[in-house]
Every structure is written in C-alpha cells, then in structure tokens.
Amino acid sequence: MAPAYLDAVPPGRDLVVVDEAHRIEQLESTLTSLFRKADMIVVLQDDRQRIRPTEEGTVENFQRFAERHGISYTVDCLASQKRAGYLGSYVADLDRLLYERQDQPLKRQSALELRCWKDLNDLDTHLHQLASGGHHVKWYAPFCWPWSRSVHNKDIVISQEKGAFEKAWNPTNEQYQWYMGNQPEDLDRVGCIYTAQGLEFDDIGVIWWDDLRWDEASHNWHIDLSQNCDAQFVSSLRREYASESAVVELVLNTYRVLLTRAKESVHIWFRDRATQDHVRMVLGF
C-alpha cells in the first residue's frame, strides 16, 4: 500500500483507504472516480472535523452516494479515540462542552494536562521551555488576524500587561519544515486551522478569541464572524447559503480541531473572561 493524492490513485487497486475523508469537497465525482480504480474504499472521517461549508465528506453524504449507486456499505464507529494520545475521555468531554452545551462540571478522567494562562507572554515562555526540553510544541490560533503570508511580519498582535504579544503566522511555503521544526523560530510562527488538521504534537498553546464566546444568559455559544479574517471561509458561507446552525457547527469544529492537537498538555489563553470561566468550570482545570 502506498500513499497518493485522491486524483493520483493508480487504477487496478483492490482497496483504497481515504484518510481525512471529511475534507472531500466534490464527493460525487471523487468517489465515482475512485470506484473506477478500486473494488473497495474505506473512508476515515469525522463529521466534527469539517471546517468549511464546501467540505462534503459526512457520514450521511457517503451513505447517500452508496445507496444511489447500489453499493453495499458498512458504518463502523471507532471504539477509542487515538487523537490526543488515546485520551478519548478528553475528546468526549470537549464534545459535551461544545456540542451539548454542557453547563455543569464534568468528572474529567483524562491524563492530558489542561492549563489556563493569564498572560500570553508567560505562556510563550513556558512553551519555549518545553521545546528546549525536547518536546514537540506549537502555537495555534483561530483565523482572526490578517495573513500577510510573510514570516517576517508580526500579523498577530495582542496587548498584554507585560507588553504586546507579537507573532507571525506559520509559513505559506515550507510548512513541513515548520511542522517538524523544534527551534525557537518555529514557536514564533503560529499555526492556523489549515495547518492543524491531521497533525499532533506533544504540547500546544491555543489562543481562544472572540469569534467563539459563551453567553451565560442564553446558555449557548455566540459566533461573531466579524472577528474572522479568513475571507475565503466567510465568502464560502455566503456562496453556500450556510444556515446559522451550520455556521455554528463549523466554528465549533474549528476549535475542536485546534484543542485536540496535543498528546501531553494543552495551554489556553482566553480573550473573553466569561468563556474562560465556563470552559474551566466544565472541564475542571
């Protein structure tokens, strides 16, 4: 078995395994092409890792395709969650926090360290210390700052009591080198959702911004797209006539992906105090 992009799968295969299948954008044509090249297709997907309205790889859409084309299929759910170092209880708790609007403390059993920080610069110092000790560490943030596509520009600037927190986004090119890198300059480049999908590190720092806030009065999540600087994402919402519930789901999915990239520790800085208090109360850290 050899890896290949979906449009480069050679013909005459017995089996094709599609990882990150929730990210497929043209499901009908993609699967039609694959079934011309393989007898069996296994798709590995997660509805809650879809982050754009154009991504069509949902369980329901795969089932509909199979039924339309008379293809027999089986749906199997993983019994354990490999993400976050097999710390499935953390992922389950996160799902209850985000999707079930859990508003009572959970009895967290995960060994994953969760820690809240008051100052981004203190957190940055801690992450650099972890990296100097041999840990694979990364910064992540939602797409809430413009991206100049230059690692020499500090696109992310956040005022702090001890001085401004300033970072560049991760490089547009040489992303693999950034992913593998464990030098100080790699931690000075913040990853976004598009450089988080499918990846895993020892420790991460996450900036929780105002695009997702907890509203205590309504006991619900509030989405503020005015905070989002991803022009392609926002325009695709309009183009696809995305409903309010669909927008909420995609933003929640984005934070779910960002918060599940670590095996040992997740360090979070919150812009909004009410959101911070709610998340800490539910997850118990």
Summary of predicted features, one role per range:
Residues R13-D19, T172-G181, D230-A242:
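Short, basic, glycine/proline-bearing loop/turn elements
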Residues T58-E67, N153-Q160, D277-F285:
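Short, aromatic/basic amphipathic alpha-helical patches
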Residues A8-G12, F35-R36, Q129-H136, T260:
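Flexible, charged surface loops at secondary-structure boundaries
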Residues V42, D186-F285:
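C-terminal accessory regions
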Residues V18-L78:
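Signature of the SF2 helicase/ATPase Hel1-core->accessory helical subdomain module
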Residues L15-D19, V42, Y140, G205-I207:
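Structural motif
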